[in-house]
Amino acid sequence: MYCLFCQHTDTRVIDSRVSEDGATIRRRRECEACGERFSTLETIELKLPVIIKKDGGREAFDGRKLRTSFDRALQKRPVAEERIEMAMRAVIHRLRMAGEREVPSIVVGECVMAELRKLDHVGYVRFASVYRSFQDVADFREEIEKLESELLVSREQLPLLEAVMESIGHPSIDQGG
């Protein structure tokens, strides 16, 4: 690999670390000529499906567009970078696991919305408002009401979960079980 500072073609690896998920290797490199150090990231490159756009056009999957979607939706939101990266990997994983050579862009959008819904509700509504072309406040209200009803159902399920856990002899969630 060439040096980012002096363009010399010989650099040596002085440290390598595998990410927690095992999908990325971070390498610390040093230039043989100028002595500058820099880091590189290696990721596995697997073929992703071609995206079929709404107008029928086709284009290669672009991870930068995916990143931009998450960044815009989560701008100024308290979501850790690590969680965003995990959500992006989940979208990419779903696309790979679909096993299709071509995937409609609507599938990508729905995957992004599913991940944003888990990450941050404000980010989810932001993305949904653009993706689904909200026309007025009523569209926002409807989406927020859907989220609220899902949260209510989730909260109602917690006592049921605790009862089941207790019936099988497992400590309750409140007791750190």
UniProtKB/Swiss-Prot annotation:
Keyword field: ATP-binding, DNA-binding, Metal-binding, Nucleotide-binding, Repressor, Transcription, Transcription regulation, Zinc, Zinc-finger
Keyword Zinc-finger: yes
Cofactor detail note: Binds 1 zinc ion.
PROSITE patterns listed in its UniProt record: ATP_CONE
InterPro entries named among the record's database cross-references: ATP-cone_dom (IPR005144), NrdR-like_N (IPR055173), RNR_NrdR-like (IPR003796)
Zinc fingers classed as unnamed: ranges: 3-34
GO molecular function: ATP binding; DNA binding; zinc ion binding
Pfam family, one: Zn_ribbon_NrdR
Family to which the UniProt record says this protein belongs: Belongs to the NrdR family.
Stored NCBIfam families: transcriptional regulator NrdR
Name of this protein: Transcriptional repressor NrdR
Highest classification ranks of the organism: Bacteria, Pseudomonadati, Pseudomonadota, Gammaproteobacteria, Lysobacterales
